[in-house]
Amino acid sequence: MNLGRCPLAPRSANIVLPKHDAVSKQKEYRIEEKTNEAQREEIITWKDNREDEGEVKTDFEVVNNENIITTTPKHQTVITPKSYRKSVKRIKHDAPQNEDIPVMKGLAPINADTESKAESMAAGKVLGSKNSSQKARLQEWKRQYKKAFPHFRFYLDGCDPSVAHRVKKQIQQLGGHVETFFSGNVTHVATVRAIQDVSVKYAKQDVITKARQLNMKIWSMEKLCNRVLKTLMENDQCTTNAPTKQGNDLSYLLYVEKVQGTNERDLSVPRQDFVHFRGPYLYVHDIANIYKPILLREWQKPLPDRDVPWPTFRATSIGRCPFVPETKYRLSTSKSLVAKNDQQLLQRQSQEPSLILRANSMKASLPDISNTGISGMNTNTTYNTNINNTPQTAISGITQDTSPSIRTNCHHCLDDGMQASGIVQSNLTSAAMSNNSAIRSGSAASVPVVTINGRDIAELKKRIIQQKSGMIGKDYSYKAMLHNTSQRKIRVDAKPGYCENCREKFDNFESHIRSSRHRRFAENNDNFKDLDELFALVQRPLRPD
C-alpha cells in the first residue's frame, strides 16, 4: 500500500487509497459517513500505533469528520478534507491492515445539467477564442492601413459633389490626399460605376481603362465609404466623442497637427502652406485650379498724408475714368456748368408762354392784307391795276420782284421778323418809285384796291423792330458764353506711362510727345519702314479701269 496523491484531487490533499486501479474501474459508489465515536477512537488508536513504531509521521487529522465535494476538470467528484495543515514530504509506505480507514470508493455519476453547462462553456470558449483572433486581425489591419494611408492618393470618379466633399474630409482626416484631376500620381480610383462586370468594355481614354493599364487600385464608392473609411474612423469617432485625458498631451497634439494641419490663427506665425497678405491686394485666379493665378499684386499701406496707391472708385464727371482722381477745379467747374444749364432751361420754359401770348395779340391787332396791294408812304396812295395808265418802264421789274412779297400772308410776317421787315422795305421802295402812279400787276383782271393808314404801318414796324432786338440780345449772350468757355484754360491731368519707341517711362504724355527725343524718332521714316511694308501687303488693291 502506497501513501500518495490522488491524481484527480488538488495537490495539497493527501488521501490514503487501497489501490489506484480501483479508482478507474469503479462506476458507482456511495459516500459513507462514519460519525460515531467508536470509529473516531479506532482512527486515533491506529495513528498512535504508527507513531510508536516510527515508520511515518503525518499531520493528517480528521476535524469533526466534515468533508466537501469538489469538481475536477474531468468532471469527477472526489472527497477532500475541508481543512488541513502544511504538506510534508511524501514517503512511500505500506498501507495499514485496518480496513476502517475512510477511502474514496468510486466516482460520482455525471448529471445531464452539468454536462450541458460544460458543453456550453466549451462552445463559449471556442467562440471567444475565435472572436479574440478576429479582433486581433482587425486591429492589425487597421494599424497597417492607417500607417500606409498618408501615401494614398485618391481620384473620385463620377461622385456626387456633396458625397465627394464628405469623403474628401474623411480621407484628409486620415492623412490621405484627394486629387482633383486624374494623373499618374493617383494610387486609388473610387468610382460609382460597376467594376465587377468584366464584360463591360470602356473607351481607351476612360479613367477605368487608364487605371487598369497603370495597375492602380480600383475601388467602388461603397467599399471606400462603408468598409474602409467606416472601419478606420470607428475608434477616431469614439475617442473624439468620449472625453479623453490626452486632450493636452503633446504626442496627441502633434498627431492632430500632422493629420489635420495646424490650427494657428495668428497671422504673424509663419506657415509652410500659406502666405498671408498684409495689405490691400488684387488676386485673380482660376476657380478650377487648372492654371496658376493670372494676376497677383499686393500694395503697401500708405502713410496718413498720402493717397492710396491701389485703384479705387472715385466720384468723377461723365466720361471720365473712375479710377483716376479728378481735380477739385474740374469738379467745381462741371457742377457750375450743370447748374447754369438747368437755370437757363427753366428761364426758357418760363418765357415760352409769354411769347405765345404776345404773338396772339399781334395777330389780332393786324388787318388782313393778303392778296392785296399796299399803299406807299402817303395815306392816300393806292396801287391801281389799270394797264393803260402804267408806263412800260423799269418799274415793271421792280413790281415783279416785290409782288410776291406783297402778296404774302400777314401771318407769316408775324412769325418771321426778317420776312416782315423785308415786306415793309419793299413796300416803301415801291411806293417811292411809283410816285403815286399805278403799278400793273401780273394779271389783266381787275384787283380790288385796299387802302391802309400810315399809323398801322408805323405800329407794325415798331413791333417788328422790338422783336428783332430781343432775338439779337439773346444771340449775343449765348455767343458771349461760348466765347468765354472756349477762352477758358482747360486743365489736363498728367497721364503717366511707358513709351515703347523711346523705351523710357514718362510722367506726362503731352510733354513727352513734344520732347526732342520722341520727335526725332517719330520724324525718321526709317523707323516705320517695316510697318509701311506690312500696310502695303494688307492694302486693298484698286479696281482696274
Swiss-Prot record:
Keyword Cell cycle assigned: yes
A GO term, aspect molecular function: protein serine/threonine kinase activator activity
Zinc finger (DBF4-type): 492-541
Posttranslational mods: Hyperphosphorylated at the G1/S and S-phases of the cell cycle.
GO CC entries: Dbf4-dependent protein kinase complex; mitotic spindle pole body; nucleus
Annotated positions binding Zn(2+): C499, C502, H512, H518
UniProt-recorded name of the protein: Hsk1-interacting molecule 1
Keyword terms: Cell cycle, DNA damage, Metal-binding, Nucleus, Phosphoprotein, Zinc, Zinc-finger
Keyword Disulfide bond applies: no
GO BP, sorted A to Z: DNA damage response; mitotic DNA replication checkpoint signaling; positive regulation of DNA repair; positive regulation of DNA replication initiation; positive regulation of nuclear cell cycle DNA replication; regulation of cell cycle phase transition
Subcellular location: Nucleus
Subunit description: Associates with hsk1. Interacts with mcm10.
Gene behind the chain: him1
Record-linked SMART domains: BRCT (SM00292), ZnF_DBF (SM00586)
Function summary: Activates hsk1 kinase and is essential for G1/S transition. Has a role in S-phase checkpoint control induced by replication fork blocks after nucleotide deprivation and DNA damage.
